Amino acid sequence: MNVADETLIKWANTHLPDNLQITDPTGPLCGGLGLLRLAESIKGRPSSPPVPDSAFPTDPNDDKLDGLFRLFDFLLDNDVKMGSVSINDVRQGKRDKILQLLRALKAWEDKRRALANTIARGSIPTNAGFMLPVVIS
């Protein structure tokens, strides 16, 4: 495991509830439930309607897929750039794909913070007393 991945896992744990913390950085990372709770934490509110923990598979052979579909809907609806990660990748706990999603969620959080900072700066008057325009693309 490299330093960047360790840093990413520490970051993820700041968003995850105690029962979903990643405790062994070399073992399984997190499943769909952890990824959804992480995304909800970044957004600052739960998905609507709420997704119960029981909607997620507990192992790769579990057929509960509703939670995973809701996770991917949430990520797509919020424009999280997931790349080539599939529901099956998450269901099977593929480490490289979970890390890819964690990176995507971190990038999404960074983008949200940058946008919030831009909006905040746009409301501060300049020396001439004019308001700075805010352009959101």
Task: Set out the residue ranges of the language-model regions.
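Alpha-helical coiled-coil scaffolding segments
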Residues: 1-137
